[in-house]
Amino acid sequence: MGIQREEHIDLSAPQILQAMAEEDRPLLLREILHRLGLQKERRQEAREFLRDLAEGGKIVRIRGNRYGLPSKMNLIVGKVKTHPDGYGFVIPEAEGEEDIFISPRNLKEAMHGDRVVARVESIRRKGKEGSVIRILERKTRKVVGKFMRAKNYSYVTPEDERILQEVFISEGETKRARPNQIVVAEITRYPTGRARPEGRITHILGYPDDPEIEPQIIIHKYDLPHRFTSAALKEAQNLPSTPPADEYKGRVDLRGIPTFTIDGENARDFDDAVSIERDKDGGVKLYVSISDVSHYVKEETALDNEAYSRGTSVYFPDRAIPMFPTELSNEICCLHPRVDRLTLTAELRYERNGQRKGVQFYPSVIRSDERLTYTLVREILLEEDAELKRKFEYLLPSLELMAELCQELRRRRTERGAIDFDLPEPEVILNLQGETEDVIRAERNLAHQMIEEFMIAANEAVAHFMEDKGFPFIYRIHEPPKKEAVDEFRRFISNLGYKSMRPDHGLKRVADHSPKEFLRVLSEVKGRPEERVINEILLRSMKWAKYSAKNLGHFGLASDGYTHFTSPIRRYPDLIVHRLLKQVLSEKEVKISDEGLGNKADHLSERERVAMEAEREILNRYRVRFMRDKIGEEFEGIVSGVTAFGFFVELKDVFVEGLVRVTSLHDDYYQYHEKKYCLIGERTHKTFRIGDEIRVRVDRVDVERRHIDFGIVEKIGKGKGDAGTGVTG
């Protein structure tokens, strides 16, 4: 970088980072000024930039007031992920960096979730080891846990085992909590080398036995916004109950076309409706009409800011934490039957064989004819219920044509390699007291597939349209899995006896692999007892899908362009997509940059991940509660994971996972064979590996820690991998 002595040079973060990138050592402030061609009068301005960059982890300040890039000083910026046993890892923010193991001693004062700077101290066979040298940002601001009293003090034992320290509560900050109650403690002082964290009680949730506290635990543990600001509520209450007629101007009127919604029985917010017509040339015209939320929610309003903060709606078995107040999500933006609603429509035209031949997007007005459910559509189309077919006779041609188009779209997606995990999902049934009454397999039928195919088609069409226009946009991306993850999964699946991913069946180099390779695995395991377990393991080997301002394609869908357009009531990215699409359609200037969209994409990806983890955990909590009165009962299950200390078994139908500890296997001494992913008895050579069918007995259920211990009754069947291994079971 040439040195220019010009006072009018604009100072920027990229300039500073570029100057540091060109040096092999950390720089003093005066050296940075010199390299940027700035006089010492700009010192304060530069110092503020450096402080902001250091706080953001882009640069690191070291002894002697020198500044440098972390990558040039063997330093890593990342997030701490701790383990209940006391150690942890730093997950680097930089793409492609491997995780760093941190021993308990080297975690120092860092807590789970903190954003830190770590130094790599050594590189061993199993990977990098290091230590935390600086905490950039504290993630944990409050702790949910059990309130306890000792002789002279009180404390909270965190409910999350990854928070390794108890939180000390001074006498005046207990809010009169009683021992063993579940409370929320706000941290007032973070741990130091000599002292535990300190806090004050802000909420008393109740006793652990009360099922009603489960949603409250999750809300506070994941810090889910669950109360709307008064300003947001006021804006929602001021919305009209029906759209005024003058707002129909400039919209395509689709009220004459049979239109309906298809959702679950318990759904309340209907934001997508579908219609279909035969084209004159024998093809079909599919209309996917999405609630025009952006018409009512303007940028930078209280409603908009609240929705952006939440990012997404969160769904529990007994309630939802919506992104918008009910006046909007269940009323003016909800596509109720037999009322006019404003929508944004994707009109997709297809040949008879499912080949898309054209697309149009436009603001529209619709009137849904019916609120159908997945069950109703299944009974009409698959079970041919005569009474229902008579009742919905006027919609029957549309439903039959949709089923036909769905099969063609699905066939085409499969041919291009789209991965359909089709995992059975658990559905928790609660009684009036909030206790788990049953855990059942959620239904997935032709009606689900129809809506799924149509929404995917609309999302892809919007992404391709916007990319062709060349404007800034927000995409839904799913990057290919890492080579290491592919290699590990290949070894695992081959060890189980499956041939799909052996080197002679493709995947010789990671660059060769495509979704089709994984699709072959799913086809090979289909119908086998271990199908669900292998699907889960394959899913875990994939990267997370996320939002991005760069179109990197969607690996799982085998799509070169994808976005989220179809759910603006419950996903904020869809609302952004609607706004951008409408700006392009109206030929207005798109006023946001790629960088601005990138920042929004990062925030919304994080909010989605928090919501998914919260939803997953509350399901797990209810499933464990379901098992607590099943002590001594026997169930059939599948070995879902094997470790040195035992193996995990997932029960069939109820989707509950528990541990058979190796110490409970008294018939032999079992050793873990890491390369074979199994436990083998020294004397009997009996094996336990993933996919084995097992009958187990429920021995212990710890509701608070969500741990279940099983005892083995018998091994029912061998997994595929036992064949030809020379090991008897």
Locate the predicted segments by residue:
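Charge-lined substrate channels and their catalytic hotspots, especially those that engage the 3′ end
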Residues: 1-287, 294-340, 378, 678-679, ...
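Classical nucleotidyltransferase
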Residues: 663-670, 683
